[in-house]
């Protein structure tokens, strides 16, 4: 019983510290990089940071606005943006989705569970 309570307390503290830090800090700690930090010409409009997505609600509660990706993916997008800019000056890539926490993935799954979208 004591071990179970201790485990529960540790998990709760871990969860609370994760909530307080914010997604962007957690993504950075896990090695993801901000797409716009790598290439400022890439535009970002995250679908799940707005309510005009398939769930109808904002899923990023802490106001995340930047796209966080694996460094290799971010570098590849930056290379593509540079190529696009050389071929079509003034045109920009638009990132609509990127790394997302499992909590958001669960909310998405629950939003479509039992519907034809599932």
Per-region residue spans from a language model:
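Extracytoplasmic cell-surface/polysaccharide-interacting catalytic and binding patches
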Residues: 19-98, 106-118
């Amino acid at each position: 019983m004591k071990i179970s309570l201790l485990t529960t307390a540790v998990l709760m503290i871990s969860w609370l510290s994760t909530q307080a830090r914010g997604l962007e800090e957690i993504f950075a700690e896990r090695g993801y990089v901000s797409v716009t930090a790598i290439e400022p010409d890439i535009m970002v409009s995250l679908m799940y940071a707005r309510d005009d997505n398939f769930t109808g609600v904002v899923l990023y509660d802490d106001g995340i606005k930047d796209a966080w990706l694996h460094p290799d993916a971010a570098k590849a997008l930056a290379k593509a943006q540079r190529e696009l800019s050389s071929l079509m000056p003034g045109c920009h890539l638009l990132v609509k989705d990127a790394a997302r926490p499992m909590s958001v993935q669960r909310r998405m799954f629950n939003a479509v569970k039992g519907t034809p979208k599932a």
